[in-house]
Amino acid sequence: MEHHQPEHPAPGETRTAEAVSPENHKVLSEPKEHPQDKDAKEADGAAGEQEPVDQASLPAQGQDNFESPPPDASSSQPGPARETRPETETAGACSRLQELPQSPRARQPELDFYCVKWIPWKGEQTPIITQSANGPCPLIAIANILFLQWKVKLPPQKEVITSDELMAHLGDCLLSIKPQEKSEGLQLNFQQNVDDAMTVLPKLATGLDVNVRFTGVSDFEYTPECSVFDLLGIPLYHGWLVDPQSPEAVSAVGKLSYNQLVEKIITCKHSSDTNLVTEGLIAEQFLETTAAQLTYHGLCELTAAAKEGELSVFFRNNHFSTMTKHKGHLYLLVTDQGFLQEEQVVWESLHNVDGDSCFCDSDFHLSHSPGKGPGTGGGSGSPEKQRQVDQDYLIALSLQQQQPPPQGTSGLSDLELAQQLQQEEYQQHQAAQAAPARAPSPQGRGAASGRPAAERRQRPKQESDCVLL
């Protein structure tokens, strides 16, 4: 590599005398064995083999350390004496080498942005973050709570935000928290929790490891990930509970977490004890029948545990959602990017385990399907009509809870019975609406069940009139 020096003695002679230090002169004077007219192609090939070594160390060492590299890197030292062509080639090789390992990371941030939706929330324009199908739901769920609590604010009319910005806002909130107790021991414990939360913070953009316990809606196996929720004062809930009226399932599941229950099922299946095999089959059946990770008993307990007006995070099917309770009913924040332009779609009711729900605006008034035309009863009706719809809907829910239990349902609680009756009513309504063709939309599921129960009760009567005629 050092034989390049004799090729251009004149152009860089004075510069070489200044640039080459005594220690470098020793290196340059060693290769006397090279012929003066060495093949340039072999020299360029050797330079191509040596340059990647130099460039690989550039990001770590920087160009300041370039004057004192190991002997294998000294071949690039005479570069300034050979005019500018070798520097250009070196810079090009450096850029190419840096792009190769960094290209996946370089493309990631370009796609790692999320649209901001502005909604009227308690009299103030408030941003919420929407997500695509593969968005980081833990980060978005927590960030939306901070936005709805006005602990984090964005510039007006901001339309796009990156996950790095969200994590920066979240990190600022964590660092701004101060311990309530001033004892030295509690302060050390608090600082340790903050350190754990800051370590876990990057995982929010990819997903959290959460292990539920089937004993309560707020029972999770404690992991460092849970410290983020604890420090921010955000409740974390789930609704995957065992029905206490199934003693076999209660005995099989016990107080185990999900991971422990899966291990138990595998162990029991390979056991020679028939009782253990049976217990394993019962536990497996519980997981299969509750694959939605939400049971009616869990929904009842969740409704009772959540506080009125409280903002929390709801975990279900490996997805984290922002949840609140309004007038005794649970609602999930609609963060699907498909509803970005739907101003009347902000909340989605959570009143059964089968996914039937109705959409509401930011004031929890029922909203209609975005695809409906104004002639079909949808769209923005008069405020009086909207209030009447909301009132009918709430009356229907109250009547469902006051109805006497039918035969065969005496073992159900009042709230569970109300959920069951409401589910039957929704199914009847969907059957009545099956005749007219409707354009498919991502909100069709909620729109079919979004009509008030008062309207749905009138439809069978209208159909019976037609039959009589």
UniProtKB/Swiss-Prot annotation:
Claim: Disulfide bond is one of the keywords in the record: no
Enzyme Commission number: 3.4.19.12
Disordered as annotated region, ranges: 1-105, 401-469
Residue(s) carrying Phosphoserine: 103, 441
Biased composition (Basic and acidic residues): 23-44, 453-469
Reaction(s) catalysed by this chain's protein: Thiol-dependent hydrolysis of ester, thioester, amide, peptide and isopeptide bonds formed by the C-terminal Gly of ubiquitin (a 76-residue protein attached to proteins as an intracellular targeting signal)
Taxonomy, superkingdom: Eukaryota
Recorded family membership: Belongs to the MINDY deubiquitinase family. FAM63 subfamily.
Protein name from the UniProt record: Ubiquitin carboxyl-terminal hydrolase MINDY-1
Lineage: Eukaryota, Metazoa, Chordata, Craniata, Vertebrata
Annotated gene: MINDY1
